[in-house]
Every structure is written in C-alpha cells, then in structure tokens.
C-alpha cells in the first residue's frame, strides 16, 4: 500500500481527560509533520486555540484519514457516519476492550508514522440497515456497524415475533429479543449471547435469539445478502425498540415489521501493517491462549 494521507481528522470522547491528553499529543505531532488537521467540534474546544473545528460530516468529506481516540463505542458512533465516505478510519484505544482501536495511547507515534507513510492494511467492514415499518409505511431507520437488536424496553420481559429470511418463514420466537449481527459485531453483544465468531472477511450475518423460551433454538448464520424480516406479534406490549449498536433506538409497536439488511455503506478500517485478527482475539478476549 503506497497511499499517502494529507488531511487528517481527529475524533474523540468529549470531557474525558485521557482522551483529551491523547488528542493534544496527536494534534501537535501531526501538525509538526505538516499535515492539515481537522478536529471534531465536540472536542475541539478542549484542545485550546488555533484549532480547526468541524463536524463529523465535514471530516468525512475532507479528510483522507480519521483517527478516533476512545473505545469501541466511540469508534462505532464515528463509523456509522464516516462509512458513507471514502475516508480511512483508525483508532487509538482509550476505552476498555478496544477491539476496533489498534493503537496504544501512550506509544502511538511509531505505528502511526508507518501508517502515514503508506504501510498499513485495509479492511472493508459492511454495515446493516435497520428499518421499522408500520402498516406498510417506513417509520424509522438507521445503520449499525455491529448489530441491530429487537428487544423489549423493560428488563426480563419476553416478546413474541416471527422471523423470515428472504420472505421465507424461518420460525416463531418467544424470547427476550433477537440480535442480527455483522461479522464485526460477532465479537460483541452477539458473542455474549452465545453466538459464533465470524471472521471479518465473511460475507455473512448471524442471528442470535436472546434467552429463547425453548430447549432447541440455536444461532444461525445466513448469507450477508439475505433480507431479515421480524414481524412483532400484535399481542406484545407497546414498549419495544430496535437498537443499532446500542446507541440509536427505533421505537417499535405491536404488529410492526422490522427489516434488517446489508447496507450499501462500508467502513474503511485501517490497521498497522501485519495486523492479525486472531492475535486480537487472543489478546483482547483471551481466546484459545497457548497452554505451553
């Protein structure tokens, strides 16, 4: 990879001391090397004067690379917006797990310098589009990087719904909800609910029922081009919703139909050269660690 970057956007978690410190270091380090640096307006005021503050959309439009400082939640929030542009996205971990944020906050310079010099790997992660229909009319929609989840608004309350794959009836469910996850999200909420890990290059979705009231129901993997339809029973209560990455919530009423399909948008995720997904699984999740 020989692509060079010229304009770089900085994105971070507002009012977070560790993030603020890393953003200041990044801004100074990048400007000293001659890069044009744009800072998301939510954090720009915390970095002092002489900062070019823009919104997230302008970062997507003008930047070659966006650096997200924070945890996976910050990365997901930025990714849902930036995926509609061609901008590459890389993360500096200032969160807990940091599954999508590769660079260490206290020693990012060496790895980032190589990335900026064109030594990096690129992954394209597809997103989901979630839509809520009521009496045939679209009522709400949004995108998700990790997962779209149908669930009740109150804890420990079962709901009833039917699931269709490409308009073919699959099954009826009585459960706490349903997770429809991308490969990116298969190491997140879907994993906690008992779903399989899908490697990022798979063109697939995984459907994971949440606490189904049955002894036989298991997660299922389907083609990424499939259209998932969930029809909510009219007998359910009214406090239902679809959550996209746990950040955006779409209201659902009894009788509504939820359509989840692959979005046309893709996140262009940048990794340092030699990025190893299985090493990330071992180091972040303690997966399959060597015994000797």
UniProtKB/Swiss-Prot annotation:
One of its GO terms (cellular component) is cytoplasm. GO terms for biological process: NAD metabolic process; NADP biosynthetic process. GO terms for molecular function: ATP binding; metal ion binding; NAD binding; NAD+ kinase activity. It is an enzyme of class 2 (transferase). It holds the Pfam family NAD_kinase_C. It catalyses: NAD(+) + ATP = ADP + NADP(+) + H(+). It is found in: Cytoplasm. The active site is at 72 (proton acceptor). NAD(+) binds at residues 72-73, 146-147, 157, 174, 176, 187-192. Its EC number is 2.7.1.23. Keywords: ATP-binding, Cytoplasm, Kinase, NAD, NADP, Nucleotide-binding, Transferase. InterPro entries: ATP-NAD_kinase_N (IPR017438), ATP-NAD_kinase_PpnK-typ_C (IPR017437), NAD/diacylglycerol_kinase_sf (IPR016064), NADK (IPR002504). HAMAP family: NAD_kinase. Involved in the regulation of the intracellular balance of NAD and NADP, and is a key enzyme in the biosynthesis of NADP. Catalyzes specifically the phosphorylation on 2'-hydroxyl of the adenosine moiety of NAD to yield NADP. Belongs to the NAD kinase family. This is NAD kinase. It comes from Shewanella oneidensis (strain ATCC 700550 / JCM 31522 / CIP 106686 / LMG 19005 / NCIMB 14063 / MR-1). The lineage of its organism: Bacteria, Pseudomonadati, Pseudomonadota, Gammaproteobacteria, Alteromonadales.
